[in-house]
Amino acid sequence: LPGEQVLYIGDTEHSPYGPRPIDEVRELALAVMDELVDSGVKMLVIACNTASAAVLHDARRRYTLGKGVPVVEVIHPAARAAARVTRNGRIGLIATQGTVDSRAYADALEAVPGVELLSTACPDFVELAERGVTTGPQVMSRAEEYLLPLREAGVDTLILGCTHYPVSYTHLTLPT
């Protein structure tokens, strides 16, 4: 966005959002977004999967339709990218419990013919990443627990549905 000022807000007081109930995440995220819109921002970008899942419909209704402020989130772009690259239509999602329970990714992929989503909540990944534990036996044990069922189900494309995952676990692959 050349020529635009970018304001980054990270809710460090309440992060990580992943372990929080989805209704609490919705309240927290909408409160921050209300302040931003009231201050005159031209666009909202929600870079957290859990926050995106929690506020997706409310944010579009409240800000895009209600006030003309576009809302960009991470769920639909990730779902579209996964649908484009899958070879067998079996897409896996690893995410926080709130993101999985919200069905936001399932809803985003619902209209894509021939695609099946298999979702797994990975709560320990966020906690480990927050503690700086990104390699070692704890991570590998959790990775096997979370990823092996997806591999066994024939998943060929994996959505990393939490921003902690691609930053903290760059070396992980589906187990063979």
Predicted region positions:
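Non-catalytic structural scaffold of enzyme domains
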Residues: 1-172
